[in-house]
Curated annotation (Swiss-Prot):
<feature type="binding site">
    <location>
        <position position="429"/>
    </location>
    <ligand>
        <name>NAD(+)</name>
    </ligand>
</feature>
<comment type="similarity">
    <text>In the C-terminal section; belongs to the 3-hydroxyacyl-CoA dehydrogenase family.</text>
</comment>
<dbReference type="InterPro" id="IPR036291">
    <property type="entry name" value="NAD(P)-bd_dom_sf"/>
</dbReference>
<dbReference type="Pfam" id="PF00725">
    <property type="entry name" value="3HCDH"/>
</dbReference>
<keyword id="KW-0456">Lyase</keyword>
<feature type="site" description="Important for catalytic activity">
    <location>
        <position position="139"/>
    </location>
</feature>
<feature type="region of interest" description="3-hydroxyacyl-CoA dehydrogenase">
    <location>
        <begin position="311"/>
        <end position="729"/>
    </location>
</feature>
<keyword id="KW-0276">Fatty acid metabolism</keyword>
<dbReference type="InterPro" id="IPR006180">
    <property type="entry name" value="3-OHacyl-CoA_DH_CS"/>
</dbReference>
<keyword id="KW-0511">Multifunctional enzyme</keyword>
<dbReference type="InterPro" id="IPR001753">
    <property type="entry name" value="Enoyl-CoA_hydra/iso"/>
</dbReference>
<feature type="site" description="Important for catalytic activity">
    <location>
        <position position="119"/>
    </location>
</feature>
<dbReference type="InterPro" id="IPR006176">
    <property type="entry name" value="3-OHacyl-CoA_DH_NAD-bd"/>
</dbReference>
<feature type="binding site">
    <location>
        <position position="500"/>
    </location>
    <ligand>
        <name>substrate</name>
    </ligand>
</feature>
<dbReference type="Pfam" id="PF02737">
    <property type="entry name" value="3HCDH_N"/>
</dbReference>
<keyword id="KW-0560">Oxidoreductase</keyword>
<dbReference type="GO" id="GO:0004165">
    <property type="term" value="F:delta(3)-delta(2)-enoyl-CoA isomerase activity"/>
</dbReference>
């Protein structure tokens, strides 16, 4: 044994050839700060071996290196800029020394090589991969950019266009694509990986392969003519501006850095990468996006822990087969859980099957599946007008009309047709689960399972625990939701549960702004362009359906009369009474016409202004700051109340529900992350300016206490140790 660290070791394989093996405790390898330091020590040992002829890098895990240890990021990002820059220089010196070894090097890459894992193998001369490879640089999705030389080596290896596509979008690619663009040199079966890598290494040692020529381009300026450079970088900057926008500085920073570094050799190019990385790491956007990643891991880990002792449902059923029911059936069948789809008439069944078939055909058109797979999936969806097959199902989700009497009747009838251990769930969006449970003989087998539309796109499923829902019931539906590829978050019961409960105060803030003379077009523009929502409140109401919102608003007002009962006729009332229901009938805040792809396209409609004039004061202008404050304060206050009341368990789950269920701007990280970034004291000062607007603007006492003590909702993060302690030399 030449060297043994906590996460890697170095040993001789055969005469003159050494292997460096990543083998961290636990299930995966991560390139954390300790591993970078250990890698530097191992390379130091290699540099002393006069008889070294070649080096093989490999992993003892199912994946090569899954990336950096993102749990370290928030503390690293708090390190002062100069110290963070020093540590990056040290880390890059390690990879440079790997790249500069006076012998050929090869990485045998299995499974994932992402982020720092990808940057590590870019420093070797050759890369041989297994068919299950996923390799790439996802850093821009975390609000940063590659910091271990990825923005320097990848463009010089692949050419600017291919590298920019991966780096700016934070993409990873599979084995075939990696081979095609030159990111790996070959793909072999897993059992042949080391043997194949050794064969390449021997050819390089024997002079049959020119490893020095392979290495040289990574040390030099990027080989691009002025015209080629102008075209590549101009197109890339345009694409990034269009897709990422101003709220996500990392992608455009990465492109500009690669452009600036193009004319330099490795050392100066790495300095430019360092100078770009460090300021990005200190942005609120990076903290928010890293926070989302960590919250996502936490939520998924919680679901995994919850379901460890239950069997995932093997057969499901859906009651009510409109667009929503068809979407749920498709998602279940697509993820290998056969589903019975029941309705009371053929027309609805046809609509549900058509929705499922449409979604499968889209997969076919995109080349994700072939005709055989399509036929196989569709054959596992069984439409029926009766309860045939219900005696075999493990879980049933009801998705009928949002009417408590209808839902109770359907659920009570279904309970008599299923096994005693079958779980029933309702896809209600607002009706309390404990109220629906009153119609059942086995309320312990019943809970809420709130999917979001469109089902195939929206990652969140709210799992609602009623007063009598058993732990096993909750675990079973969490297991089914996870199997469907969704992110389940368990909440406690109340009108609207969590997501709709906090959404309707936001809509109430919108209604009050319109009542006070604001223009809905400006509100939408501010909330989209400035705050960052995917759609403004008027457009969102049109998509949700004005009639749906009108009904849900009444349910919420009955549930929380002190805050959500309004004493005036608002814009939603006016549009509802005028039969303007949004996209579903082509008339809402906007008029809708189908574009060439059959999608609704919004257009101005002067008739709306006349309708709104009946329920509004004369038009007046509001500042962007006032619009954002008046829209967001009611939502954030309600989010805090939900945490204080135990409707949602943690700030992490609340923020993920908002991001995954409502499209809360990821660069803000969710309501609690936004609140922490703003500061509770500053938020309180802002909210108190608007408390005259009514109870929705009254800050909860718990938040007032946070403001008094200047406490955050997320646990404070300590800066990483001084860089000297991180072994920088």
């Amino acid at each position: 044994m030449l060297y043994k660290g906590d996460t890697l070791y170095l040993d001789w394989l055969e005469d003159g050839i050494a292997e460096l093996v990543f083998d961290a405790p636990g299930s995966v390898n991560k390139l954390d700060t300790a591993t970078v330091a250990s890698l530097g020590e191992a390379i130091g040992v290699l540099e002393q071996q006069s008889d070294l002829k070649g080096l093989l890098l490999r992993s003892n895990k199912a994946a090569f290196i899954v990336g950096a240890d993102i749990t370290e990021f928030l503390s690293l990002f708090l390190v002062p800029e100069e110290q963070l820059s020093q540590w990056l220089h040290f880390a890059n010196s390690v990879f440079n020394r790997l790249e500069d070894l006076p012998v050929p090097t090869i990485a045998a890459v299995n499974g994932y090589a992402l982020g720092g894992g990808c940057e590590c193998v870019l420093a070797t001369d050759y890369r041989l991969a297994t068919p299950d490879l996923r390799i790439g640089l996802p850093e821009t999705k975390l609000g940063i950019m590659p910091g271990f030389g990825g923005s320097v080596r990848m463009p010089r290896m692949l050419g600017a266009d291919s590298a920019l596509e991966i780096i700016a979008a934070g993409k990873d690619v599979g084995a075939d694509q990696a081979l095609k663009i030159g990111l790996v040199d070959g793909v072999v079966k897993a059992e042949k990986l080391v043997e194949g890598a050794m064969a390449i290494l021997r050819q390089a040692i024997n002079g049959d392969l020119d490893w020095k020529a392979k290495r040289q381009p990574k040390l030099e300026p990027l080989k691009l003519s002025k015209i080629e450079a102008a075209m590549s970088f101009t197109i890339a900057k345009g694409m990034v501006a269009q897709t990422a926008g101003k709220h996500y500085p990392a992608p455009i920073t990465a492109v500009k850095t690669i452009e600036a570094a193009a004319r330099f050799g490795r050392e100066e190019a790495l300095n430019l990468e360092n100078k770009s990385f460090v300021p990005l790491a200190h942005t609120n956007e990076a903290r928010a996006l890293v926070g989302i990643f960590l919250n996502d891991q936490y939520v998924k880990g919680k679901a995994k822990k919850l379901t460890k002792d239950v069997e995932t449902p093997k057969q499901a059923a859906v009651l009510g087969t409109g667009i929503m029911g068809g979407g749920i059936a498709y998602q279940s069948a697509w993820k290998d859980v056969p589903v019975v789809m029941k309705d009371i008439n053929d027309k609805s069944l046809t609509l549900g099957m058509t929705e499922a078939a449409k979604l499968l055909n889209k997969q076919l058109e995109r080349g994700k599946i072939d005709g055989l797979k399509l036929a196989g999936v569709i054959s596992t969806i069984h439409p029926t007008l009766d309860y045939a097959g219900f005696d075999r199902v493990d879980v049933v989700v009801e998705a009928v009309v949002e009417n408590p009497k209808v839902k109770k009747a359907v659920l009570a009838e279904t309970e008599q047709k299923v096994r005693p251990d079958t779980v029933l769930a309702s896809n209600t969006s607002t009706i309390p689960i404990s109220e629906l449970a009153n119609a059942l003989e086995r309320p312990e087998n019943f809970c809420g399972m709130h999917f979001f539309n469109p089902v195939h796109r929206m990652p969140l499923v709210e799992i609602i625990r009623g007063e009598k829902s058993s732990d096993e019931t909750i675990a079973k539906v969490v297991a089914w939701a996870s199997k469907m590829g969704k992110t389940p978050i368990v909440v406690n019961d109340c009108p609207g549960f969590f997501v709709n409960r906090v959404l309707f105060p936001y809509f109430a803030g919108f209604s009050q702004l319109l009542r006070d003379g604001a223009d809905f077009r400006k509100i939408d523009k501010v909330m989209e362009k400035q705050f960052g929502w995917p759609m403004g409140p008027a457009y969102l109401l049109d998509v949700v359906g004005i009639d749906t919102a009108h009904h849900a608003q009444a349910v919420m007002a009955a549930g929380f009369p002190q805050r959500m009962q309004k004493d005036y006729r608002d814009a939603i009332d006016a549009l509802f009474n005028a039969n303007r229901f949004g996209q579903k009938n082509g008339l809402g805040f906007w008029r809708y016409k189908e574009d060439s792809k059959g999608k609704p396209k919004k257009e101005e409609d002067a008739a709306v202004d006349d309708l709104l004039a009946e329920v509004s004061q004369p038009k007046r202008d509001f500042s962007e700051e006032e619009i954002i404050a008046r829209m967001m304060i009611p939502m954030v206050n309600e989010v805090v109340r939900c945490l204080e009341e135990g409707i949602i368990a943690t700030p992490a789950e609340a923020d993920m529900a908002l991001v995954y269920g409502l499209g809360f701007p990821p660069f803000h990280g969710g309501a609690f992350r936004w609140l922490d970034t703003l500061g509770s004291a500053k938020y309180l000062d802002m909210a108190q300016q608007y408390q005259h607007l009514g109870p929705l603007y009254e800050v909860p006492e718990g938040l007032r206490n946070k403001a008094r003590h200047n406490e955050p909702y997320y646990p404070p993060v300590e800066p990483a140790r001084p860089v000297g302690d991180l072994k920088t030399a």
